[in-house]
Amino acid sequence: NNIEALYRCIEKIIRCAKKLGKLVVATGDVHNINREDRLYREIIVNQNVPGKGRHVLARYLSGSKKACKNLDNINKVINICEEQEVKTDNVLNKVLKYIYVLNRIKKIPITASNISSIYSVSKNSQDEEIFRGKDGDAEKLKAISTVLRKLNVANVVKEKDGIYELNGNYIESEMPVPGHIPNQFFRTTKEMKEEFEFLNDQELIKEIVVTNPNKIIDMLEEIEVVEYPDKPYSPIIPNSQETTINMVFEKAHSMYGDPLPRNIEERIAQEFYGDNILDLVKEKLKIDHPRLSDERLDEEFPSLLHEIIISGYDAVVDIMADKLKRESEMALDDKKVREDAKAALGGIIGGGFDVIYLIAQKLVKHSNDDGYLVGSRGSVGSSFVASMMGITECNGLPAHYYCPKCHYSEFNNEKGEPYSIEYASGFDLPNKNCPECKTLMIHEGNDMPFATFLGFNADKVPDIDLNFSGDNQASAHEYTKVLFGTDNVYRAGTIGTVADKTAFGYVQGFFEERLYDQLKIEAESYGLTVTGKDELKKKGVIKSFVRIPEVERIAVGCTGVKRTTGQHPGGIVVVPGYKDVWDFTPFQYPADDPTSAWRTTHFDYHAIDADLLKLDILGHDDPTVLRMLQDLSGLDVTKIDLGDLDTMKIFTGPEILGVDRYKLRGTVDKDGRKYCPTGTLGVPEFGTNFLLGMLEETKPTTFAELIKISGLSHGTDVWLGNARDLCTPNSEGKIEVPFKNVIGCRDDIMVNLIAWGMKPVKAFKIMEFVRKGKASKEPAAWAEHVKTMKEAGIPEWYIESCRKIKYMFPKAHATAYVTSAFRIAWFKVHHPIWYYCAYLSIRRDQFDIESMIKGADAIRAKIDEIDEKGSAASNKEIDTRETLCICLEMCERGFYFKNIDVEKSDGKKFVITDDEKGLIIPFRALDGLGDNVALAIVKARKEGPFISQEDLSTRGKVNTSAMEKLKALGCLDNMSESNQLSLF
């Protein structure tokens, strides 16, 4: 209703600013590219903003703490802004912003009456009342005070102790108007000019829309907001290269002796400096000893290679520089040659990644010193150097033996053939005594090329991901502050976006809200009261009137929109000491709390991952379970035999556990009978229904096959419709390819192709192409690879299997998972009560105490009851079923559960009974009790025994509902109700 007054205000501001020599620029506050996108923004804001849809500016102007907790900082920014901006719409907000600058108004929601009242009292005011004059705060304060007085007279605001607040009574009768989201789409120049047609001055319009914005652009300095260097800026650790070299050779010599076997010496050299290092040293050897025969040169090569490697980085650079000088036809500057030589080197040290390895080593050692194992993720396990530094337990060498006493090692059998031809994993090698000292040798190696981690010439940036115990993760995070300093480490920021299903709910909710508002207005016009929206939805009165296809169409526009910011669960970004965090990103505090222990990068970490090192210090249950098993047993879990035959048997059936598979629950056989085909329930990576099916079909008997199964289960289009069809009987009962030969992990492709005679570089390129699923995306390139494979004699079934693959799991990751799983499975077979205690304490959250304490039959009945519900079963019931399947197995093995004991139960963990045949259920297992109350009970019990139910409730902070559940279970039968004693 006041649009004309609004136009006059804008015109006054513009002309006043021009007289004062101010640069007036028309800007668009753009949130959308297209005009139609406004609906999407309105839907998103409607869901995410407290107050149902109030724009963030409206929340800021009203002093809402939800808008921003740094209002003073925003006000400072407003005050130092030199240019006067003319918004293309919603100019009222600009005026209100000016009023709020001096913090004189505590609360001004944007409503219809506010707009009308403010402009009705300000349209005839003097220019200085709207425009912030050049004479500073005195004039602005005078102008604002005048406006506030008029608002007060108009009953829009009220004054108390010098603070102006919105008059609540004035607002109660107001109905917020729809359309609270401004039109913030990206306007064309023509559309921008049309917005200012009310000025009736084409020259002025052109000036503020075209000329002045260009002047602003010309004033701006061109900057690179986010740098994109060749590799991340890493911290500096003094003597890192020397430390890395010494650490690796010290460990290698302790295992394989000194001098090292040639293949190990070469592997270390290639990982340190890239594949070219071998040819470089051979060339130097020939030049230095031109008269030696090829046979003699070959004999001398290992010792010279070792001498050069331990001499350090500079020695290798010198050799490369000499090579470049020899190959150049012109004289080269020494400084330039050394720079080129450094650039030509790859690998861990040659590429400058030794610091990253050392950091990972320090983090792992810190956790190990605290008593926790650390699992490796990704392909870092294929790095033999990482293995020697203790970063990973995986050994990437081919299958082999080594003697722990005299350090003899053996990679070939009596025929001179590599063990890796028959054994894909060294853990499957039969036991063998050392031929030198008769000591039982250790079998090792899982045949993983280093190229899968750092590329063929070790030219990729290493990404070392580690799985720490959830109990020790926070300690590992804090340790980075010790390593680098508090001001140099930040939690990696993330941006959460709207998922497709969430967007669908947003859209439906938006239209339901709109329908409810219309219904409410209509009802109130007749003096009727409308009940709450949720109640009307239940009755079917309120539901989206928009057709599902239209809802889906609109939801697409909302999908992927920024919803919130957060932090990576384990990502720590390291800013080196020679750089400043501001060179890369602002930072923020979680929940805007400056006292938070950690600060978070404001930019999503993906935006700066090329600039800064990100440490992935992730939490995982396996190290926690293994630590608890180690504490319970007193055994060193790293000494467990990964070739234990009894443990291997649980992957083909539960009989080794002493139970009948048809008394267990897991899945259903072809005749509809419930059973469990394996003994792997509760074994990480091997206990899900999908894995139970895979295990039943593949019947693995070796560690290598377990690794292959892990790779197959984590890949995409690798098992179903691919390997499964090759290794399981067809309609004629025939198997096309033995299971051990199918492709399971990405490393298998490179190893297999090399074994078939293909050059390593070609094999690597095909592996990279296949594992990324490019065969269907790049048919021309795939045709060339097919030609290469056919020329090498690769079977058709293998080529076709490669074609189908969309994603492949790294073998090192699978090996690390299977290693942890096998150790846990070993306890399940040989020390079951410790296993069940650790598993249920750490990995399960949902329990059914009533059936657990009654034994196997009651547990089986409860599982069947949940199964009968089918898809109607809740997530909680499904989780409970998983727990009960393990509990059933435990009871069938002759063990039992003891009810919650007020005097003996732990807060969170199961406790082994004195006869070591049962487990006492912890307090947290009681539905609705919660960890905090469970721990409070234990803490209060340590201070003194509970003398009554009243005492338990009071000191243990147990609510009435939980007390009733404890009574129903019979946990309180031996306790009086009150603290008072009865004399009668």
Predicted feature locations:
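Conserved, mostly hydrophobic/aromatic
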Residues: D29, P213
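Histidine/acidic residue-rich metal-binding segments in metalloenzymes
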Residues: E4-L23
